[in-house]
């Protein structure tokens, strides 16, 4: 397959994974804002659904304020996009798509929500409350680590 055609296919795969994350995460946050009350819902064991809002980046980290947080996240997203569009076929495209989708989805939520906070609603008790975009970023990172451990190059040379 010619290099240019392969590049377009990889770009499309990364963007499809990212778009899937953005859609699912946005719908889950909408549901959480409309369905969860102030008490939350016990699901099973330590898992609770509790609505809260987070001004930080991920898992309530870095509360520097909306401008700094937005600039940091946008810089990270641009770097991930640059690297992702040079990804090798396979696990790397999935990992980069999950990273990109999670970062973009949280940033969309932060930009449209006043006072520039992200909707979080998944609680496991001992860990900061998070959302599906946070989980997507974490899983994307793990997928990239697995790809590297299997000897895959993450980007084309």
Predicted regions located by residue number:
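Alpha-helical transmembrane bundles and membrane-interface segments of multipass inner-membrane proteins
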Residues: 1-157
């Amino acid at each position: 397959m010619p290099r240019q055609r392969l590049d377009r296919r990889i770009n499309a795969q990364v963007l499809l994974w990212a778009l899937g994350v953005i859609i699912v995460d946005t719908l889950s946050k909408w549901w959480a804002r409309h369905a969860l009350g102030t008490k939350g819902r016990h699901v099973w064991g330590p898992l609770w659904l509790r609505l809260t809002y987070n001004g930080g980046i991920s898992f309530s980290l870095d509360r520097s304020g909306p401008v700094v947080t937005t600039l940091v996240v946008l810089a990270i997203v641009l770097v991930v996009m640059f690297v992702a569009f040079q990804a090798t076929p396979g696990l790397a495209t999935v990992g980069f798509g999950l990273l990109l989708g999670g970062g973009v989805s949280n940033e969309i939520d932060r930009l449209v929500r006043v006072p520039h906070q992200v909707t979080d609603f998944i609680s496991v008790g001992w860990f900061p409350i998070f959302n599906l975009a946070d989980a997507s970023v974490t899983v994307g990172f793990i997928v990239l680590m697995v790809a590297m451990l299997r000897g895959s190059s993450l980007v084309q040379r």
